[in-house]
Amino acid sequence: MQVILLEKVVNLGNLGDIVKVKDGYGRNFLIPQGKAKRATEANKAEFEARRAELEKQQAEQLAAAQKRGEKLAGFMLQVTQKAGVDGRLFGSVTNGDIAEALTAQGFEVSKSEVRLPEGPLKAIGDYQVHIALHHDVVVEITVSVLGE
């Protein structure tokens, strides 16, 4: 199935690219999420008519993400969790916990934007965590896990 991408899709292409994808990926993910349309002649003509509008929208989203990223860059977040004597936590600190703590601090961050490369944090200490605000804007913050 050939589709026209309506926004940048990681590992696939950029706005306006016509790419060939598996039928299930196109029908079940790209098209319902509004990331692509089938590459028919009518849709190609409609896309070309709306191209400038879509590019402007994408540029605005990037600018907003960069603005949020400047505020977040280098931020140090402290999270407290019950811990044992050896420094291991009872439970763990997940991306949802980090997103909640950042929202409480005044930053709008969803849990899907928080990237934990080694999985949930399970011990006391300082960790570098990536916040992916946009495909092109990834900010690194420090999360300090403290024991109670």
Curated annotation (Swiss-Prot):
Family: Belongs to the bacterial ribosomal protein bL9 family.
PANTHER family referenced in this protein's UniProt entry, alphabetically: 50S RIBOSOMAL PROTEIN L9 (PTHR21368)
Lineage of source species: Bacteria, Pseudomonadati, Pseudomonadota, Betaproteobacteria, Nitrosomonadales
PROSITE patterns: RIBOSOMAL_L9
Coiled coil feature spans: none
One BP term from GO: translation
Species this protein is from: Methylobacillus flagellatus (strain ATCC 51484 / DSM 6875 / VKM B-1610 / KT)
Gene: rplI
UniProt-listed InterPro entries: Ribosomal_bL9, Ribosomal_bL9/RNase_H1_N, Ribosomal_bL9_bac/chp, Ribosomal_bL9_C, Ribosomal_bL9_C_sf, Ribosomal_bL9_N, Ribosomal_bL9_N_sf
NCBIfam families referenced in this protein's UniProt entry, alphabetically: L9
Function (record text): Binds to the 23S rRNA.
GO cellular component annotations of the record: ribonucleoprotein complex; ribosome
UniProt protein name: Large ribosomal subunit protein bL9
